Amino acid sequence: MKARLGPIALLAGLLSTPAVAQDPQLSQFYASPMYLNPALTGNTYQDRLQLNYRLQWAGIPPGFETYAVGWDHRAAQVNSGVGVMVMHDRAGSNGLSFTQASAAYSYEARIDRKRAMRGGLRLGYTQRSFDPDNFLFADQVIRDNASTSLESGLIERVSYFDVSAGGLYFTEAFWAGFSVNHLNRPDQSLQSDGEARLPMRTSVHLGHRIPLDGLSVGRSRTELTLAAHYKAQGKWDQLDVGGYLHLEQVSFGLWYRGLPGIKAYAPGYPNDDAVILMAGFETDRQWTFIYSYDITVSWLARSSGGAHELSVRYEWPRRTKNRKAKIVPCPKF
């Protein structure tokens, strides 16, 4: 019966404690720009296709998996970006999952030739579901592990619309942005007589690109990028801080995630999550492949197995030297 206690706790938390619900997180957060901030939609010279995969807690089979695919386009003639994205997240082997399809739009306003601001909006349609056959309910335990539950009032599938927005200020070398997700606080409850409003997720991110070969930003092929990303949802918050080094077509990154000494989840459980190692390879400025591994440093370190993450990006070649596309915001892994 011990093997089934995890599903009991997971379902109990899902149904009765909505404040702890968290969105999927990506260590390579800039590798999924529309998910990070809709203002980053179309932050490329042309079209872009992005694929993301994350396996979290691989040491607790089958782990938690997140898949995402996105496409966006920069319409420089109207100072805009448009894109679409699909994300699927599965929690363990218990059939608890969510799938979201969304569309994003961004608009760019130039301050001068070297500075600009962008605003973005993302509208999504989400479906959350679970398979009750994979859970053990309290009434089954009471009835000597009965094969079926008498539990009533559960909804196996719930759907809702979701609204996110964000803003960005940027130059060729510096950027600072914010985003707010779930502005409409949709109800994600899986109980027919309950309510579980999804907490808003806020994000603040900034960074700086430093050329190391004497060339200007944008022309340099050897540069250091330093960045930080703070995110909060309900009672949960974390800070990612680190950087990555570009050496021609190869990149290496090192990050830390947590808020040690500043905040604890509970007495004896500090907000100390992971050290992230990252490596990537770029081919002729079109294909980019990035792999990262989260080394868990929290109390789960011995059993979690860390997290593996892979991102693949393809950017269509730049067709014209459009003056409106002189600067492109945000770094690229």
Descriptions of predicted regions:
Residues 22-333:
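Subset of outer-membrane beta-barrel
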Residues 17-21:
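Sec/Tat signal peptide C-region and signal peptidase I cleavage site
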Residues 8-16:
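Bacterial N-terminal signal peptides
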Residues 1-8:
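Bacterial N-terminal signal peptides that target proteins for export
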